[in-house]
């Protein structure tokens, strides 16, 4: 799984976050994993 702070996509195309949450703001190319 992807560690917190590393890049991710909410749709899971780059893998799943260890925390289970990918934070992505509108307009961002990619998000990052973090705790919810």
From Swiss-Prot:
Recorded superkingdom? Eukaryota
Pfam families per UniProt: Antifungal_pept
Task: Name it.
Answer: Antimicrobial peptide Alo-3
Would you tell me the Gene Ontology cellular component terms? extracellular region
InterPro entries per the record?
Antimicrobial_C6_CS (IPR013006), Gurmarin/antifun_pep (IPR009101), Gurmarin/antimicrobial_peptd (IPR024206)
What the record says about its domains? The presence of a 'disulfide through disulfide knot' structurally defines this protein as a knottin.
Q: What keywords were assigned to this record?
A: Antimicrobial, Disulfide bond, Fungicide, Knottin, Secreted
Tell me yes or no: is Disulfide bond among this UniProt entry's keywords.
Answer: yes
Its biological purpose is as follows: Has antifungal activity against C.glabrata.
Where are the disulfide bridges?
1-18, 8-22, 17-33
Instruction: Tell me the organism's taxonomic lineage.
Output: Eukaryota, Metazoa, Ecdysozoa, Arthropoda, Hexapoda
What is stated as this protein's family in its record? Answer: Belongs to the AMP family.
In its UniProt record, which GO terms are filed under biological process? defense response to fungus; killing of cells of another organism
